[in-house]
Amino acid sequence: MIGEQYTSIITGFKSALAVSCIAVSLFLLSPWIAYARLPSSIKSPIKAKGPLSALRACLNEISAGAKTSTRGYELYSKKGQSFAMLNINFRPQVILPPEHVRWLVTQPEDILSHAKASDDADALGYIWPLFDASALHSFSKVLQIDLTRNVTQTEKDVLEEVQHIMDELVGQTESWKEVNMVQAFERIMYQATQRVYVGLPLCRDSTYMGYVKGYARSLGTAMVFAAQLTPWPLRQVTALLAGLPVYYYVLRVRSYLSPLFKERMERLKEKGGTQDDNLEGEPRNLITWMSDGVLSGVGPKSISPSEMVTWLGILALLPTDNLWTTCTNVLLDLLSSESEHAYLHTIREEARTVFASSKESGKPVSHGLHHIDSAIRESLRMNSLSPRSLHRQVVRRGGVVLPDGQKVPTGTWLCVLSGNIQRDEDYYEDAQTYKPFRFVPKLTEAGGDKAPLLPLTNEKYLTFGYGRHACPGRWFSFQVMKIVIAYILANYDIQPLEKRPDNIVFADLNIPHLSHIIRIKRMT
């Protein structure tokens, strides 16, 4: 009897061991299996001749940064050829050359899917199993319409918050003070955007703001970990585990915002009437606009206040880290530029002039800040937050033929190297040189004292994407960054830097170090 039990245990152990060995073998073979599906004629800077070399190539990308993709860009993209890359997540990707950008963004969703690629590129569908992309798209229209339409009010709110924070950080005295640049911009951007999203007094509630930052930070971390750093066979499990802090913080944020959404929607329902009549007397913030969007049919037809908090987090809270990252890059670039160019002086004088004229005319301040606008564009061109963009997945049965004649199978990831395109001498004069006023002539010509008409996206400037899936909040983001930088430079003196510090480059991330200390004082 006992012998039979031992035999049964041993048999079970052998079976479990066999299954485990098969699972591990398939896991280790997965990079090669996926890579081998691509046509043998497609070029690659990676020499993956078998399962081990494919696995090694994936692991090497952890520390390679953009080196491998840049080599592929120089070898193949500049010759109009597509090439294949292996990634940390064990899934190969076909990189298209710059000439194919328009073709890529104009393909129908049933041929090249943006939605499918986004599911894998940001892993939201894995972190939130009930993720509804249609609801996200509906609320993105609210960002496009209401945030842009209420530019004057949002500028006023942002200015009040940046003034309030700078008074606390630096004070009213004219003595030099050391400030952590990243921490300063992080606080400014979170609090200023929250002023627009939820209003006073909540945007200055330290406990609430802690939960907001935790929500955005944990969600961003989970997305990077699940989408970029986890081999795709393990993504479902790791996304759920990485999402545990997200679930905690979203519950905390919901405890503050769900009652606000519920109360605002009930009040708007009672008013009835037209959309403009509904908003009369209501706070001009994103809580109101999202609530009105649901009731007016712009947003999803059926959604709870708690769900609205989730979408607010994904659409509005998550991108906030990109704002302070960009502002830090802009200031690092300006402070380390050669003094004879007088970039800071020009921007400071423009900001003061525009602030003064705006008080008299009532026109939005951001419309006249052409030099700051150009400086932000240039820093984003030089320091692309992500080196790849325009992600698409082939969903057409039987695959698709690329413009260069290569046929790739269903399920293949496609993208372009936006970071390399934006620093290519073929598309930008002196592309490797920082020229903060590079875009000023076109901005002045296109905008005058009105909102700049120079697009934030085109085939050679892909920071915010391109085409119908470009970032819906890009104009608002630019407006906020211009206002913040303009106010700081118009009212504060900052000691220049001897050298521009290098950024942290890891996987598809390119961010400043978090410990930059600057010396700053208030100007009379």
Curated annotation (Swiss-Prot):
Induction: Expression is regulated by a complex signaling network which may include cross-pathway interactions mediated by sensing of the cluster final products or shared biosynthetic intermediates. One of its GO terms (cellular component) is membrane. Its cofactor is heme. It is found in: Membrane. It holds the Pfam family p450. Heme binds at C471. Its EC number is 1.-.-.-. Glycans are attached at N150. CDD domains: CYP503A1-like. GO terms for molecular function: heme binding; iron ion binding; monooxygenase activity; oxidoreductase activity, acting on paired donors, with incorporation or reduction of molecular oxygen. It comes from the Eukaryota. It is a single-pass membrane protein. SUPFAM superfamilies: Cytochrome P450 (SSF48264). One of its GO terms (biological process) is secondary metabolic process. Gene3D superfamilies: Cytochrome P450. Pathway: Secondary metabolite biosynthesis. The chain crosses the membrane at residues 16-36. Keywords: Glycoprotein, Heme, Iron, Membrane, Metal-binding, Monooxygenase, Oxidoreductase, Transmembrane, Transmembrane helix. Cytochrome P450 monooxygenase; part of the lna gene cluster that mediates the biosynthesis of diastereomeric piperazines. Lna and lnb clusters encode sets of enzymes that produce overlapping sets of previously undescribed metabolites such as piperazinomycin-like metabolites or morpholine. The lna and lnb biosynthetic pathways appear to be part of a signaling network that controls the formation of sclerotia, a resilient overwintering structure. One primary function of the non-canonical nonribosomal peptide synthetases lnaA and lnbA consists in the reduction of L-tyrosine. Belongs to the cytochrome P450 family. This is Cytochrome P450 monooxygenase lnaC.
